[in-house]
């Protein structure tokens, strides 16, 4: 039995509007706080006298634990539903941030970071399946709104955290948002309805495995996941090294470089909201390909530009690639069979987050070989490949998947 609903409802207003707002605010906090740690690393490194390798390892812990939660969360979605998982994510993430307050050693900082990665890892798969089944008529716009809110959080919260840290210390910057996580947990519980289709029992293990294997042989899913992985690979590398590149190679101050990174997320937020509307009108595959193609020139231009204004404009425009996220998420989730949707989506997210996280490693190796400029050309080439893949995506026809 399908869980799809809302075939003819409005994106805003009513119960669906309240649900969309609560999920968007939650993602604003979850994604934004994931980029606060990198922003505060210089301060944390000074306190604990860390090497760059140790500081980088802290970020690795955050993303690895986040990726590790994607599959088990997807499995849980098919059994307990999104409501409980979204609330648990907000509660656990808030508790993890409190752990930073009582972390006198770097080892405990790593523990807190791992806990935060685990807590935030519950949010993504649950958010995806909830939006897909609730906003069938406005799927692209709904995903764009929520992921756009996350991009605003990624732009705003790191900047705010550095201001708080300068006055009150980095621990205060981490725990300042804990009350907001608590409030979001309450609102999510009130606005997200439980599933009414027997989700709590879930399909049998053997049947789930068979459905997963069948899903991963679907050409649409293979192409979509490949394109998504290539785009995420570039995004991870870009956000990890844009500030370093602008500071070391283009000789901008770290403050200016950090502001350009924030500009990237602002452009990403705007393009995500607009991309969803365009896809709802012109189709997902053509829109995805167009976004990927438009994302190539900024990557090619960066190594060939000088001057603060030019670098600020082009560096910010690299955020256009972020609008691929909500569209490809909607395409993949909407293609998966209903009865294993959460499980399959969680497994796929674990896969492309794990592979995509290697982008920063590859670019880091190239940078140490004095090939920093060439790294951006590599990212541009991979983005072109993603565009070609998106052009071959068939129109989506939702399978029922349930009997």
Which residues does each PLM region occupy?
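Conserved MFS/SLC helix-loop-helix module at the cytosolic interface between two early adjacent transmembrane helices
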Residues: 68-107
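Interfacial helix-cap and linker-helix signal at transmembrane-aqueous boundaries
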Residues: 44-45, 76-77, 160-168, 246-247, ...
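Cytoplasmic helix-loop-helix junction between adjacent transmembrane helices
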Residues: 110-152
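C-terminal transmembrane helical hairpin of 12-TM major facilitator-type secondary transporters
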Residues: 282-328
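Helix-loop-helix hairpin linking two adjacent transmembrane segments in secondary transporters
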Residues: 137, 145-196
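Helix-breaking motifs and short loop linkers at transmembrane-helix boundaries and internal kinks
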Residues: 49, 81, 101-107, 136, ...
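Flexible cytoplasmic inter-helical loops of multi-pass small-molecule transporters
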Residues: 2, 189-213, 398-403
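Extracytoplasmic gate region of multi-pass secondary transporters
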Residues: 38, 218-270
């Amino acid at each position: 039995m399908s869980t799809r609903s809302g075939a003819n409802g409005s994106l805003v207003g009513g119960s669906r509007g309240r649900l969309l707002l609560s999920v968007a605010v939650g993602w604003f906090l979850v994604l934004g706080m994931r980029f606060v740690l990198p922003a505060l690393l210089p301060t944390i490194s000074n306190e604990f006298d860390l090497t760059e390798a140790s500081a980088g390892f802290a970020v690795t812990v955050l993303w690895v634990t986040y990726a590790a939660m994607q599959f088990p969360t997807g499995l849980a979605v098919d059994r307990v539903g999104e409501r409980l998982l979204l609330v648990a994510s907000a509660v656990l993430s808030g508790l993890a941030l409190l752990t930073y307050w009582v972390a006198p050693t770097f080892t405990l900082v790593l523990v807190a970071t791992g806990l935060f990665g685990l807590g935030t890892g519950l949010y993504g798969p649950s958010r995806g399946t909830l939006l897909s089944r609730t906003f069938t008529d406005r799927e692209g716009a709904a995903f764009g709104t929520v992921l756009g809110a996350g991009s605003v959080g990624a732009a705003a919260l790191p900047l705010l955290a550095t201001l708080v840290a300068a006055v009150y210390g980095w621990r205060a910057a981490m725990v300042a948002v804990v009350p907001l996580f608590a409030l979001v947990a309450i609102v999510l519980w009130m606005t997200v309805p439980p599933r009414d289709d027997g989700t709590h029992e879930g399909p049998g293990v053997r049947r789930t495995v068979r459905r997963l294997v069948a899903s991963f042989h679907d050409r649409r899913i293979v192409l979509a996941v490949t394109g998504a992985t290539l785009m995420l690979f570039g995004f991870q590398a870009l956000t990890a090294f844009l500030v370093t590149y602008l500071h070391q190679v283009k000789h901008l101050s770290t403050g200016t470089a950090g502001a350009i990174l924030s500009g990237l997320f602002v452009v990403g937020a705007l393009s995500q909201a607009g991309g969803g509307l365009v896809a709802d009108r012109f189709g997902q595959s053509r829109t995805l390909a167009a976004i990927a193609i438009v994302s190539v020139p900024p990557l090619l231009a960066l190594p060939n530009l000088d001057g603060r204004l030019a670098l600020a404009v082009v560096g910010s425009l690299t955020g256009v690639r972020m609008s691929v996220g909500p569209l490809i998420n909607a395409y993949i989730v909407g293609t998966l069979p209903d009865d294993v949707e959460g499980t399959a989506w969680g497994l796929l997210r674990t896969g492309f987050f794990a592979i995509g996280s290697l982008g920063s490693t590859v670019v880091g190796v190239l940078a140490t070989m004095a090939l920093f400029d060439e790294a951006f050309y590599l990212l541009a080439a991979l983005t072109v490949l993603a565009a070609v893949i998106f052009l071959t995506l068939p129109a989506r026809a939702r399978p029922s998947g349930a009997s």
